[in-house]
Amino acid sequence: MKLYPHILSIFFLHFVFTTAFAQGKEDRLNKIFDVKKTFQKINSFKKYKIVTIKDAEKFLGSNTDNGGSLKGYFTGDSLKKIVEWVGLSNRIIQNEFYFKNDTLVFVYAVEKNYHYNNHSQTLDYTKLDLTFTGRYYFDNEKLFYSIIKNENRNKSKQKDAADFLIKSKDYMKILRAELR
């Protein structure tokens, strides 16, 4: 009969941990759903005031080989989306930042490398190869979920997320100054 209390304890602990894990997973899924609703709503709206900066030096601090641009999508004074486009000598980087109440909630990041032609041993600037996509989900300025399509970049997702938070704040200031 001494075994009975131990069995009850095991079942109780199993129930507590299973319930807590399920609740945590459900909370995360709800947050992901909310973020998806936010960026779908932002992308479906069509009457934005768009502020464009075509001088990469203004937002990157230096020019790039193939230029760059920064676009801010505003409704009134409220910034909803930023699109950063950077053309480097060997690739193109595009990051889309999505905001809810001036707080970063999502980043969609894409990198495409210029195709390398083995025959001519040069880059083909007419063709791009998709090399990276990343989806970063934020809650209260913390990364809580990500989908990364590149094993090497998956290792740096926390650093990438921190960089996105810093960039989003810097870009927000720059674009707001241009709006006025």
What function would you assign to each model-found segment?
Residues 24-87, 91-180:
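Buried hydrophobic residues that stabilize the cores of well-folded domains
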